[in-house]
A protein has these predicted regions:
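C-terminal accessory/tail domains of diverse enzymes
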Residues: 1-37, 50-191
Length: 191
């Protein structure tokens, strides 16, 4: 690799601790090759959505939308709000429209672009939900924490949704260690 080469790295499906171990090795190799990331890069995480029912879909979208202002705080400025063409905000979509959707197709119609922080269009092709907000990184710590955050949010969405205006310290699906990690990220990225 030299400084003129750009590429997109796509992993195979990774699952559980074994998947995280493989990811850690890849991050180590990328770092040892002096791979550099810039503001045009994004980390896109696909999570299995094959077994989602409509309640889980609605709760997930409402939770992400209601948490978006807090999530924005621990993302770089280039990934906040609607500042990035490739990961649009969910804020402008009315809660009632999300709640009234009867199936995934209706939700996909409400969120027709794949260039959203939460991409529902991925479901039709891959049976996944894609999260596009995170900035590009080769830091295993950042990726692991983000994947765990998303996994816990999805698990929570199977039973409920976050209320509007919720603060990071009140996210019920995060443990104290992960809350501390994101508080430190927020402080580091404060504008």
């Amino acid at each position: 690799l030299n400084g003129n080469d750009t590429f997109e790295l796509v992993s195979p499906i990774l699952e559980g601790e074994g998947g995280l171990e493989k990811l850690e090795r890849v991050c180590w190799v990328l770092d040892s090759c002096n791979v550099k990331i810039n503001g045009s890069c994004g980390l896109h995480v696909h999570m299995n959505a094959e077994d989602f029912n409509i309640t889980t879909w609605r709760n997930l979208l409402l939770s992400y939308k209601h948490a978006e202002a807090e999530i924005d705080k621990f993302m770089p400025a280039s990934r906040r709000g609607s500042s990035n063409t490739y990961c649009g905000s969910l804020i402008q979509f009315p809660d009632e429209r999300i709640r009234s959707a009867r199936n995934i197709r209706e939700l996909q119609g409400l969120f027709p672009s794949r260039y959203m922080k939460v991409n529902l269009q991925a479901y039709s092709r891959h049976r996944t939900v894609e999260f596009r907000q995170h900035s590009g990184t080769i830091s295993f710590t950042k990726i692991e924490n983000w994947v765990c955050f998303l996994d816990r949010m999805i698990t929570f969405a199977s039973v409920g949704s976050l209320p509007a205006g919720i603060r990071l310290e009140d996210f019920p699906f995060l443990g104290e260690k992960q809350k501390l990690y994101y508080k430190l990220r927020t402080k580091k990225l404060a504008v």
